[in-house]
Amino acid sequence: MCGRFSFSPVIRIIEERFDVKVDKTQYKPRYNCAPTQNLAVITNREPCEMKYFRWGLIPFWAKDPSIGSRMINAKAETIREKPSFRIPFLKQRCLVPADGFYEWKRAGSKEKIPYRITLADRSPFAMAGIWDRWKDPEGRQFYSFAILTTAPNELLSGIHNRMPVILSRDQEKAWISDTDPAE
């Protein structure tokens, strides 16, 4: 499970790497992005602008927003089957920019050792995400997201049994396009 990540590049690097406009008044480097925080995403609806959504998907049909704190990740293998994720997977996809993520390896029955995982060159990358919009009883809108996870690659399999879906640059464009996400 991906439960923490970092996103700390300077604005110029973000704008060049993701071809987006960054609101300088909103962006702050984050070294410990955590569930329920408002974090940067790039959506299929507005792919040229960085938005800030709450981490923890609140489905549009939820009666209470607290469900979101339990839905920070979505398994890529079963995403089409889960009612909370099915519509966002088909229509509301996003990139979750990062420059590292954290996984904890169990060492014995009580201890966990944290690992920060980055690309070899430490450059920013995008994790696949889905988003949704929820309205509270007063009509206020809240935007939230979840990160897709998959089985770990060979490098991570000794640390954890899941990892975020990390997209190549070509996959990023396809992920936030209007094409079928399964392609």
What does each model-identified segment do?
Residues M1-E183:
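Short linear sequence motif anchored by a di-proline
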